[in-house]
Amino acid sequence: MSEIKLKYDTVIKTLDSVKDALADVSIGAAGSNGKNSLDYTKKYHEREENIKTMLGDYKKAVQKNIEDTKDNVDSLKEQDEAIAVK
């Protein structure tokens, strides 16, 4: 029978590094366009706001995945410890 070992510390360190990298994901603000009121400028700003919204949604989803993964890994560790006691 095969044996699968959980390297808990390695997994948690990797999740922490993913969390740190996620915190660095951002998009800068658009520069000033002065008094430009071109259709292109308006569409550009709308598109940029949409991208910022999508990026925020993406970050929330990744954060949720990180939390879920950590919870699952903690559960696996607890199960391994319970089995080892038997």
From Swiss-Prot:
Keywords: Coiled coil. InterPro entries: DUF5344. Pfam families: DUF5344 (PF17279). It comes from the Bacteria. Disruption phenotype: Deletion of the ywqH-ywqI-ywqJ-ywqK-nfi operon has no visible phenotype, however it is out-competed by wild-type cells. Residues 57-83 form a coiled coil. This is Protein YwqI. It comes from Bacillus subtilis (strain 168).
